[in-house]
């Protein structure tokens, strides 16, 4: 359950049409499924929304585990973010999370230099079982395209998949309240997927997260994004130690 909520966040992640100054508001809902052998059960749900606030975009993702899953690992995550309309560049990112016995609050404020540099002023506050475990301000630096865990979802949907060949890779820097990582998108071609009662033609994309020295920081995840003008991620999938988790759009 935790991994798929993080997968939704890490896509990573909605934009209808190609983004521009007149991007309409939208709300997209997902169910989080746990699959292991014959077990196929809904473990949670998530809602991600976008609003045009005039000078910028505001987005929010809310993810919850289902009551039966709460017995094993409770997830109550809320992500908030604001983005410049020009290039979907993030301005502010915030994650409020209750995961198991921990409560976390991460923030990132983005500053852009004239030379293409990006500075992230980050804070991370962690409380476990009522005890303060971390209160860590830090500053992260990057060059070129840089996103957070929420704006990456929109960035992905605006990539020119229709111009890519199978096997093409493109990377972007991603800041969280904890660290800097590289998020690499690998294009796997066009596939058809069945979600609920609908069949979609999709771009299949694999996501890879790496840290310093190219070391993997989490397992790969896969997403299927419609080839139409909406570019909707209709299915996301990640592996667990036992079974796998799948996020499906509610249509």
Predicted segment positions?
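Active-site/ligand-binding surface loops and adjacent short beta/alpha elements
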Residues: 117-175
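Sec/Tat signal peptide C-region and signal peptidase I cleavage site
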Residues: 16-20
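Sec-dependent N-terminal signal peptides
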Residues: 4-14
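Acidic, serine/threonine-rich low-complexity disordered tracts
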Residues: 21-114, 158-251
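Alpha-helical interaction segments
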Residues: 9, 63, 143-144
């Amino acid at each position: 359950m935790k991994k798929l909520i993080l997968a939704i966040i890490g896509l990573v992640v909605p934009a209808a049409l190609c983004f521009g100054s007149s991007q309409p508001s939208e709300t997209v809902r997902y169910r989080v499924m746990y699959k292991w052998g014959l077990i196929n059960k809904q473990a949670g749900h998530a809602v991600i929304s976008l609003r045009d606030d005039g000078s910028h975009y505001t987005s929010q993702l809310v993810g919850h585990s289902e009551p039966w899953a709460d017995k094993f690992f409770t997830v109550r995550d809320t992500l908030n973010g604001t983005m410049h309309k020009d290039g979907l560049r993030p301005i502010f990112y915030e994650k409020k999370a209750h995961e198991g016995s921990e409560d976390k609050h991460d923030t990132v404020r983005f500053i852009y230099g004239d030379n293409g540099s990006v500075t992230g002023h980050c804070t991370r506050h962690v409380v476990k079982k009522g005890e303060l475990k971390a209160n860590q301000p830090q500053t992260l630096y990057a060059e070129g395209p840089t996103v957070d865990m929420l704006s990456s979802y929109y960035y992905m949907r605006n990539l020119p998949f229709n111009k890519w060949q199978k096997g093409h890779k493109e990377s972007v820097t991603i800041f969280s309240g904890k660290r800097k990582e590289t998020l690499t998108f690998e294009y796997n071609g066009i596939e058809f997927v069945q979600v609920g009662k609908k069949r979609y033609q999709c771009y299949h994309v694999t996501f890879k997260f790496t840290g310093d020295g190219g070391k993997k920081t989490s397992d790969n995840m896969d997403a299927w994004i419609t080839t139409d003008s909406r570019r909707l991620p209709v299915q996301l999938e990640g592996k667990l130690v036992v079974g796998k988790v799948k996020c499906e759009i509610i249509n």
